[in-house]
Structure formats: C-alpha cells, structure tokens
C-alpha cells in the first residue's frame, strides 16, 4: 500500500508513540505531556489544547475552552456498559422523538450534541460519558454546560470528577426537569495533577432515558503562566507566576505551587480549616463539624470541603432546626484605627430559598458589649459552590465576629476556611477586657435598630400593617392591601434613593456584585439617571468572590401580573463586546431572558421599556451583568428609576375585549405568552416583511431563529373573554413562508379544561398572505370565559410566521377552503348511516383504515374514514359526508382531495356538489392499490354550496374508504402532473421528509419581496407577476439533505413526455446546487436527469421521455453539491404529456435541452447491474491510486457523474444504467 508523502511522517510518529506506550496527540509544537490539556495554550495555534474535552481556539488569557460538538466529540468517550449509551447526534433526527428538535449552539436542527437515546430495557442502566485526561485546574475553574431532558425521562443526572483515587460528585439531581435546554454551572476547585470528568444519566424501568448535552465550557481553569516581571503590587510566585495581593493567604492555591500559601508568608494569619477542630472559634449552638465521605445527612450537603477540595475534608454545617439560629463566634481582637483587620471566609448556601447567613461585628463598650452590627447578609439558593467573601474591619474598640446561620426547609448553611489577617491582633488572654467578656450575648437579645419595635401579633412571614396581617402570597402582588401600601414597598419599583433599594437584593457569588451606591462627579456615570450627582443607583462593583460569574440582583417573589405589565427603567452600560447587561425573569426555577442592552452600550443613561405581560405567581426579576471592570476605558453598568407599571391583574382596559385587531394601533387584547424564550413581536413593515392591511403597517411576526430562542414555541393569546353569542366566526390572515418553517396552531382555552385545537397548518404555504376562518362554539353558560391562543411551534428553523387582520363576527363561518383534518373534522357531518369517522391510525375507532395519513405521512396524522365491510355498511348502502356551506364562487374553482381505498374493492366513492340541487361530479371505483390518490372536481357555483362525498358499499369484508387534504383553489383543475404555478402548486406536493431534513419547495413570484434569492421573472408570463416553485439550497446542511417536490401518482405508461423549465443561480462554479428528476415507484427511486448549476440568469427547458410498467410519481429533488451559498433553484411550466413522445421544440427564450429517452423499470436486475458498474469504477479508481502519483494533473477533469454523463443541458444516459439514490420508501 502507498501513502502520500504528507501522511507518511504523521503515520510514523503515531506508530512510534504507540510503540513507546505514550499518548499521541496532534500537538504541533511538541509540548511536554504535562502541558497538554492544562487549559493553557503553549503552542501558538493552541493545538496542545484540542481533543481535551474542549478545543483551544484562542491564546488570549481567561478565554473559555469550549466544545459545541459541531465538528467532533472533542475527545469525550462513552464508557457505558449496556445498550443505554452516549453518541454524537444531530438535532431533529426524529420528528416526534423525545430528544431536542434543535441544538443549543445554533438553536436549529443543523446543530450537533451528545445524546443518549431511549432504551427499552427493563433493568436500571446508566449511560456514562467521560472526558479525556485534563490537568491542573485552577481554584477559579468553572465547568458550564447545557442539558436537555424530556419530561420524566430520567431518574438521575450527575457530574463527577475523578483525580487520584478519589471521585468527587460536583452535581447530582433527580429533577424536577424544566422545559428545553437548561444550564448547569459548577466550580471544580483546585485540582492538582491529572483528572477526568464524567457526566452520567441513570434510567429505570419507568423512564425512557432521553438526555442531550451541548456547549461544554471550561471557564478560567488555567493556572497563571510564568512571567519575568509582575505588575506593580502583585506577588511573584516561586514558579514565576503572578497573583494579586489579596490572593495571598486566602486559603486557595492561586500560584499553582502553593507558594502564595507558604506558611512563612502566612504565619501571622489566623486560619481555621476545621480539619482538627474549631480552633479559636466557639459556638453557642447549632453548628457541627463534619465531612461528606460516606452517606450524607441531606442531599443539599456539600459533596466536598473547601480546604482540601475532598469529600474527606471537614467543614462546619448548621444543624439548627428551621427557625432557629446557629451562632459561631471568634475570640476577641484588639481595636485599631490605623490598620485594617481583614476577615476572609467561605460559606455555602444550598437547598432552600429560606436559608440565611449573616456576619455581625460586636464591639466592646465601656462596660458591656455593644449591639452587634450587621456587616454581611446573604440568603436563598447560591448553588453548590463554596463562596468566598471578605470584610475589612476598622474598630476603635475590641471586637468579636459573630457568624449566624439559619436553615430553611431542606436547606444547608456551611462554613469553611475562616482566615483573620495579620493585622487582626488577639486580645491578650489574661487582660481585663477578656475577663469582662465572658461570652457574647445571644443575638436574639439585640434588636438591629435603635427603634423599639411593637410586639408582633402576626404569624412568621406575614406583614403587619395596622390591624391587618398580610399573608406572604399577597405581598408584591401589585395590589395594595395595606392603607399605606407597605405590602408593595419592596417589590422592584424604586428610584434607589432609599437604602432598601426597592427590594432588589444582590445574590452574586463571584468577582462582581450589585451595590447601592451614591453617584460621584469624578466617576462614570457622574450622576444618577436624574442627572443628580449625589443621587443613588444600583451599580456594578467589584466583589471578593473567586469566580468570574455574572453579577445578579433579584426581587422578592412577585405576581400574579396582568397582560399590560411593563418595566420601565434607566440603565447605564459601557463594555467590551464580551460584556452584557440583561433582565431575566425567574419562574418555577427556570430563567427566561427578557431584554439585553445592545452592543457595547452608549456610556450614558438610557431609558428602556420592557413588556413583562401576564405571569403567574411566583416569579422574580433579575438584573444580570458581566463587565470587565479592570479592562480599558471606564467600563461599567448601572440601573436606576425602575418602575413596574400596569401590573395589577385586575385592571382592564377597553382593548382587553378587542379580539378583532389589525395591529396598527397596538396589539388589542392579544399579548405574548411566556412559556419559552421564543416570542411573537409586533413589527412595522420593512424589507420583505410587509403587513396584510396596507403593506406598510404593523403585524405580528415570529422568526424561529431569532436569538436567543431555544424553546419549543411562542404563544400569542387573548385576555379571558365572555361569549356574546353561541357561535362566532373568527377570521385571520396568516403567512407561513420558508424552506423549513414549523407549525402554526390556533386553540381555545377554558379554565380547568384541556386546550381545544381549532386549526393548524405546517410547512411553507408560499410567499403570500392566506386567509383562514374558524367557527367558535361556546358553552351554553354565558359566564364561562375562554381564551384564544396562537402558537408558533419551533419544529422548523428557516422561514417566518406572521399574523394580521384578525376579525370576529357573530354566527358561523363559511366552510374552510382547505382541510387537513389534523385539528378537527372541519365541520363535515356524516349523513345516512353516520359511519364516517375522524381519526388517525394510531388512535382510531374504525376497524380498518390507512396506515398513515396524507398530510403528515405518519400514523399520528388524521383523516376521515368509513368502514365499508358488510357487517357495518351492507352492500349498496350509502354513507354520506357533507361539508358546511361554502361561499358563492365568482369564478370557476378546483376542488381537490386525496382518497385512499382498500385493496379489497370497497365500492364506489361519489362526489356531489349541492347548490340549489345536487349534481354528481365524479365517481371513483378503482381501489388504487392501497395508496393515497388525488381526485379533483371543477366547481362552478353562483350560490352557497356544499360538497358531498358518498361511499357506496360493495359488500366486501375488511374494506374502507378514506379522505384527506381537501382543498379549494381558484381556476380550473390542471392535467395530472402538469402545473404553471400561477395559482399554487396544483397537484404537486412539497411535504417535507424528516429523513431528508424536513425541507420544502416554496412558491413565490418575482414581484413579492422575499428574504431568499429568487428569479426576478417567471417563465409562464415572463414578468415579475408570474409565479414559480423554488428552493433556496443555502439552508441545507451536509449529509444528503434535500427537498422534494412530488407529483400525484401517475399510471403506468409505455411512453410519455415530461417537459419543464428550470432556473439555477449560484455566484461561483464551486457553489453548486443540484437539481434531479427522480421517478418513484413501489420498487424504489430512479434518477433520470441531473443538473449542477452556477450563475445562469435565464430559464432553461428540459424534455424527458418516460416509460414505466407500474404506477409512479415524478420527484424534483433540490440538493447541494458544493459549499453552501445563497442561490435558488426554480422550476416552472411543468407539463406531463401522457402517451406522447417528446418533440424537439423550436428555439425560444433561453436554451433548450435535447429530448432524452429513459425506459424506466426499477427491477432487481438493473439495480444489480448498476452495483456492478459502480464496483468496477471503484476498482479502477483504486488501481489507479496504487501508482502513487506525486501530484494530479491540474487540468484533468474532475471525476464524477456530472462531467461524464451530462454536458450542459443536453442529457445522455447509458441505455441500461440506473441509479438508486438513498431516499425514503415509496412515496405513494
């Protein structure tokens, strides 16, 4: 075997490394093995940090090392021992599967992630994903990732870290699981030497076990690199690294060689790590010293201590009962005004929002201890990390430090590594002061203010105001229950002139925090939002935490809120591109991004309005920011003048009852829902997005790829409405446009009832507005309120949805112009024997019916079916299905429908049009070989009319008839297989195939603005007003994805002519879309014509003669043969001339292809012959390679089917060669 010269050296190195028993990595600069995968780029191209569970892409310090699984698995390996295993997978592989339909990186189905699929085994099993060996994690190292779990699919998730002989559990949970992608952030702590990370999912017999993992990020994990000189004031470590002065003697190995914690440097510090006891500290009650090895008392307990980062390390934990306080107190220290005494400590708050940690300073008065002064207060859920903090103390009197912890239900408060700096001088043991302070007085004896509070008469958690006791659920509910509104005082609305800050509380755990500050003239911003220099605002400030985490400020629990609820505020923001300022809502433990400051900010105060809408209680608002305060320029962030307006849910306006809306003034009664991070937006017409009302006005718009949307869909719903009449007609205009757009649904919601699906459409409906209408059936009780909701589902990611001109009128609607039976029976009523049934094969009542519907091609799709077996419908008897009334027609129309008749002859399907009289338009008796067939009827009706389908039974056992996808289109019915696309796609179907990516051909005209490139004129009319079918190939990803446009089933033919015009436009030759013509039958698919195109701004004609001995469909396949680029493929004026040979047309506009004769018989012999030909070509190519040429000829034609068999548009097929491209099974 010969190897190319450029691969030979790589192969030799690999074999040499294997022979020496060493790990071989693509390390271009040959770093020592200890410097590989250590979160530091030693090579100029960072190649020493690839396949490490992440990819090193930048040599910039503090850059995160990430893996988004788009190119490979980054070295992560499945080490599962059962069939329940991890693999790298792509989003949307299964349309209705349990996994995510989009990845987290891109939010589309083109993205990749690691996934463990469903497992049908009855035994419990665990799928384990393990990282490669990593080395030397810094104390600041943070691992972040996103995971996705279908509801109740997994029993447990856990994240472990193994180093040496110990395995640390970094995170573990058994739910509850939230919707969509959820973020996990854990701190690894300082890890010396080698370590691995494992992510595992455990399922049992009651769980399917579908889990996905994406966007793994290692943040700030690298140790500082050696430097010849350190910045002024920094400490130079023994290994030549530099650390900041406050990192000395702080209980963490910041240098990487522990020289910053050298006992010689830290000998004057008083450090207590609880490994051998409490040291000089004492407790009144409630604290106990413990470790995490073995079984833990509570799931919220720390899995490791801070000092040793080990489960065997000791810490203090609060064991006080909920409602009581555990108190730890220090020895007495001497007072000093000249020197700061610094106290560094690490605390742990996890498991309960009600847990509380406080730090008090208690100074000694002349004779007795003074009232303790609160210096730090933290409460709530701060995660599983040990949080560092520090206080600097200046006291003229001797003092003690008191640490108080109060645990909420299921919560834990922990302490570790209490460090007093060298300037904290102990009071001599036998001093007079020491003897006078026999011990601290319990905290409960000291009120925190000098005002004597009245005796509390309300229960804990209740607010006392006058004679009222306001319960917790009525606090911050946007309704005043107290006379002075005290129950709404600390609920987010504030100008920050009061120290209470309107209830906003900092919950940061890292190097940044939110603080209530006074504006200074010499700093930025120079004043608050009111331009007052002494004014106050909420400002982003430095903190003593060790992690590079976002700063967070949170309100108390709020709600419920009404649909008009808005937050008005002023903000200041200036940052480099990586910084941000955002507003988040926290609801049921999950976070939704509401707003983010644009770009790098303006550096001045800016007013902003954010719609919050109707939300259930409890929810909280949170300001989140990450800014490099040490970076160049005056970077920073601030918030002021926060006002929550119109949030009372009881407040109504006239517009709340306005269902009819053209969205020109506002959104009337319609408002956005908040179940996911995808949202409808009211926008003004611009570019290719034009409203329906005027073409220049407003409408509701949804872009499924609008960042940062990752949720399943977006809701647009009304306020609760009171019915006016028993039946109302709701009409609206909608647009579903794009090569891979999702589903738009309309539903009705009543209290304590399941939502009622009224209408739905999926996939592209062309680049235009369509009108739809639905009859609303109200309950007899007039007091029963209802809501209407439109939901745009993100099961497609290329295209847009839009709504406009919603109108409601009394009385029922006309019959719909199209019906897929997916949401309802569309008003069709069974007559006669009443045997027609609305069902799907998966959940049907009829004994017999099609395996799949026509709309979705799945067993879950719906249709109408009648069982014509003699025991149900005797021979000669009729089962009728009658539509509602259609409005009169101003011009002839074509009624199309798809029917399915069993192979045992079920009888006859008759179609009648009932105007003033009933007239039969069509009669079908052929069974159609158990496949969906297209039927069509020309309709002319000057009055209101109905369509009636009649099933006449033949008395045959196990027989049935079914109907699906009934549609009424303007203009006469076209011939089978033919279409000029002026009124639509005729009988051609663009149903997306999930196995091909779920893409669809679209329908448009040159005059209609489009976000995708398209021909400027059609071929039929040669003008911008003409229409055509087209597909934009740039949305396709790699891996054989394609879009199909399929004809209706066509009968067997000895000779027929297919004639069509096509258009292809690509900027360069290597940007190549491909157009194929396939013939599909029960035996597979056969490619009969192919063209790969580049820029040709003209329409070209092709003729193909076809013959086939069995029924078939014509398929136009658009796919990608090169690099993705904007470029359309379009077709127009398709003619199928049954029983006719192709004739050479006279030259006309554009080029003309020569006719091609293609006898089609997709038999086993031909497929086998094709296999032999391909094997022969492959063998010839292999033999050629054995000569090992040094370089190919630069002017040789590229090998491939295109240049061999096709020349421009003149097609020459070898007489007996066929191809069988991989594709879904029989399309019939």
Swiss-Prot record:
Cytoplasmic side: 1181-1228
Ranges for domain MAM: 65-223, 270-426, 492-649, 659-815, 817-975, 977-1144
Domain (LDL-receptor class A): residue spans on this chain: 28-49, 229-267, 457-492
Signal peptide limits: 1-21
Glycosylation sites: 204, 290, 340, 641, 841
Disulfide bonds: 230-242, 237-255, 249-266, 458-469, 465-482, 476-491
Positions of transmembrane segments: 1160-1180
Subcellular location field: Membrane
GO CC term, one of those recorded: membrane
Residues in the Extracellular compartment per record: 23-1159
GO biological process: protein localization to nucleus; protein transport; Wnt signaling pathway
InterPro entries xref list: ConA-like_dom_sf (IPR013320), LDL_receptor-like_sf (IPR036055), LDLR_class-A_CS (IPR023415), LDrepeatLR_classA_rpt (IPR002172), MAM_dom (IPR000998), MAM_domain-containing (IPR051560)
Pfam family, one: Ldl_recept_a
Membrane topology: Single-pass type I membrane protein
Record keywords: Disulfide bond, Glycoprotein, Membrane, Protein transport, Repeat, Signal, Transmembrane, Transmembrane helix, Transport
CDD domains according to UniProt: LDLa, MAM
Gene3D superfamilies: 2.60.120.200, Low-density Lipoprotein Receptor
Role, per record: Probably involved in the sorting and selective transport of receptors and ligands across polarized epithelia.
Protein name (record): Apical endosomal glycoprotein
